[in-house]
A protein has these predicted regions:
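Active-site cores that bind ATP or allylic diphosphates and position pyrophosphate for catalysis
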Residues: 18, 63-166
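N-terminal Rossmann-like or analogous alpha/beta NTP/dinucleotide-binding catalytic cores
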Residues: 1-86, 136, 165-166
């Protein structure tokens, strides 16, 4: 027994389709699929549009920067220049165009248990530091979902095979 939460993951503004959210709700209604909470319904964990949760994501990326778990890269002549000094980074985000990257400890391997594949291991030396905040100020899909899953108390996530490593 669980709850069906409808969350609108609209962080990719370049692919945003107007009224797609109402079409999703209409399709769910057509098939008599009733969500327990979401936009305009039992808003216990709202807002349910990720584009309306930017301050929450900002709080978390600032915490990551302060704890040296993430860093900014400032755009300069089309290149991303990393800034690892926390104080300078916090100043630059006020005035510069930037992205935030998660700092990966490339000396490690991560092991997880997947219900379908069993034990899976990832070698972090093969992974670049991923961008978690894009230059438009919006979080990436992965960063927003981890934060939202935590705050919405999501216990089970079902995604396609292509998302396993993320």
């Amino acid at each position: 027994n669980g709850e069906f939460i409808l969350r609108i993951e609209d962080t990719d503004q370049s692919r945003k389709v107007d009224s797609a959210d109402s079409k999703i709700i209409d399709q769910l209604n057509y098939f008599n699929i009733d969500f327990d909470e979401g936009p305009n319904k039992n808003e216990k964990f709202g807002p349910y549009y990720q584009s309306q949760r930017l301050q929450l994501y900002k709080k978390h990326y600032i915490d990551l920067i302060k704890n040296k778990k993430a860093y900014i890269c400032v755009e300069h002549n089309g290149n991303l220049i990393p800034e690892f000094d926390v104080d300078l980074a916090l100043e630059k985000i006020k005035t510069s165009k930037f992205v935030v990257k998660l700092l990966i400890n490339s000396d490690k391997k991560i092991s997880i248990y997947d219900e379908l594949r069993g034990d899976v291991e990832f070698d972090l030396s093969l992974i670049d530091d991923p961008i978690i905040i894009k230059s438009d100020g919006f979080p990436t899909y992965h960063f927003a979902n981890v934060i939202d899953d935590h705050y919405m108390k999501i216990s089970h996530v079902i995604r396609g095979e292509e998302w396993l490593s993320s």
